[in-house]
A protein has these predicted regions:
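Short amphipathic alpha-helix that is part of the acyltransferase structural core
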Residues: 6-42
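A positional "C-terminalness" feature that preferentially activates on distal terminal regions of long
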Residues: 15-16, 209, 238, 246
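Acyl-donor binding region in acyl/amide transferases
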Residues: 19-20, 67-206
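Conserved beta-hairpin
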Residues: 30, 42-67
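Short hydrophobic/aromatic beta-strand or adjacent loop that forms the aromatic wall/cage
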Residues: 43, 211-216
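Short beta-strand-to-coil "C-cap" segments at the C-terminal boundary of structured domains/repeats
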Residues: 217-222
Length: 249
């Protein structure tokens, strides 16, 4: 049955596409995102281009991919019968940012833009980075997100991570994920930096609680491909029902 939603998505095919962009070109968009920062280890920047009815083209958003937030993420997705990772580091990307101009979402023909762009992004990564097999993405529960747009694109949901204590860079206003982030302050290890945060009021760090994040994955070859079936069979975590936002009283 042809639905209104399917007609809207069909219309997007003629008016929306992705185009490679430089870091400088996406920064203006990233600064408007709620995270307010440009991610590290970026591999691919794409502008979301909208061809208007008058023929002019506007950049209405950006989608950014790169290495995973946690360097060991690739080892924690799927394993073979002997417990060896089915994926190598270069075979896993993370969708690091997706930002769309608020005014673009008000255009009737772009009402399904976010989910459509994610689908375009997966196809673009498969085309431009053929070695990549899996794209992971996270929804920040601390921001009240459940990943509704990923659910709309049939992403595989692998659950929510636990709340953890993490180092926070006070000057930059961001979490510490990599050793080089503490080394620039003269610390050799994360443990040294954590001890400094606990005992030194003037430490560049403080220890905060990082709320767990909802994790989703996309298998770029499709779940019905031989590769997709192999990854599905080896998933370390069970596939779970999609989370929903609590209903307000």
């Amino acid at each position: 049955m042809i639905t209104f939603k399917s007609l809207m998505i069909e219309g997007l095919k003629d008016s929306v596409y992705l185009e490679s962009k430089s870091k400088a070109e996406v920064l203006a968009f990233i600064k408007q995102h709620y995270l307010k920062t440009y991610p590290t280890a970026v591999a691919a920047n794409y502008g979301v281009m909208y061809k208007k009815p008058d023929g002019n083209v506007d950049m209405v958003g950006v989608i950014v991919y790169g290495q995973t937030t946690k360097p060991q993420d690739f080892e924690e997705i799927a394993v073979d019968d002997e417990g060896n990772s089915l994926l190598q580091k270069n075979e896993v990307f993370e969708l690091l940012r997706l930002y769309l101009k608020p005014e673009a979402k008000q255009i009737p023909e772009l009402s399904n833009l976010a989910s459509y762009v994610i689908g375009l992004g997966n196809k673009k990564i498969k085309q431009d980075y053929p070695e990549v097999k899996v794209v992971i993405t996270r929804a920040d529960s601390g921001q009240g997100h459940t990943g509704a747009i990923y659910q709309a694109t049939n992403a595989i949901y692998l659950g929510k991570s636990r709340d953890t204590k993490r180092l926070w860079d006070k000057a930059l206003g961001k979490w510490i994920y990599r050793l080089k982030q503490v080394q620039k302050y003269g610390f050799e290890t994360g443990k040294q930096a954590a001890n400094d945060a606990r005992t030194n009021p003037n430490s560049p760090f403080e220890i905060r609680t990082a709320t767990g994040k909802h994790m989703y994955i996309y298998i770029l070859s499709g779940t019905n491909s031989s590769e997709g079936k192999r990854i599905l069979a080896g998933l370390i975590k069970d596939i779970q029902p999609y989370p929903k936002k609590p209903v307000s009283a």
